[in-house]
Amino acid sequence: MIKAPNIILVGPMGAGKTTIGRLISQSMGKEFYDLDKVIEDNAGADIPWIFEREGEDGFRKRETQALASIVESDTGDCVLATGGGIVMREENRDILRENALVVYLYASVAQQLYRTSKSTHRPLLQTGDPRATLKKLFEIRDPLYRDVATLVIETDSRHPRSVANKVLDAIKRHLKMEITVS
């Protein structure tokens, strides 16, 4: 059997990283981590509180520390769902590229808005115009997600199980390709 590396999911808010991550970790028999939950557990506080007290920069520093800690301690043995802004720091992009098979779960701005419309735990969306915020974030982050991604999977209008199966199939194809190419 082919041993898969760490599988790290990146993408915007509402792409389904946590839901899909749980499903594929169960199928692959790997440990699952939600990076935001790890950060909250380490800080003893929730993300909105961290943003309020330390600002986005303080949160991003915690995010880098948590990411590095997970990939170093469980090399080849986990599925990790990241926060939407993981790609904003070059250091994080380097860690992602060097330590994992990175899956970009693509979601359009319209889909992101639909999926996040009822959420109160997304500090960056606590604005008068969430659509404009999501559009701006997408324009900045989409090229960065693509830069670190090994695989890109579209999630718009798809059921989580369907997306998870698509991710698993793409991972299998990718790993077979890696083995046959020498």
UniProtKB/Swiss-Prot annotation:
ATP binds at G14, A15, G16, K17, T18, T19, R122. Its cofactor is Mg(2+). GO terms for molecular function: ATP binding; magnesium ion binding; shikimate kinase activity. Gene3D superfamilies: P-loop containing nucleotide triphosphate hydrolases (3.40.50.300). It catalyses: shikimate + ATP = 3-phosphoshikimate + ADP + H(+). Binds 1 Mg(2+) ion per subunit. Substrate binds at D36, R60, G84, R141. GO terms for cellular component: cytosol. It holds the Pfam family SKI. It is found in: Cytoplasm. Mg(2+) binds at T18. PROSITE patterns: SHIKIMATE_KINASE (PS01128). Catalyzes the specific phosphorylation of the 3-hydroxyl group of shikimic acid using ATP as a cosubstrate. Belongs to the shikimate kinase family. Monomer. This is Shikimate kinase. It comes from Marinomonas sp. (strain MWYL1).
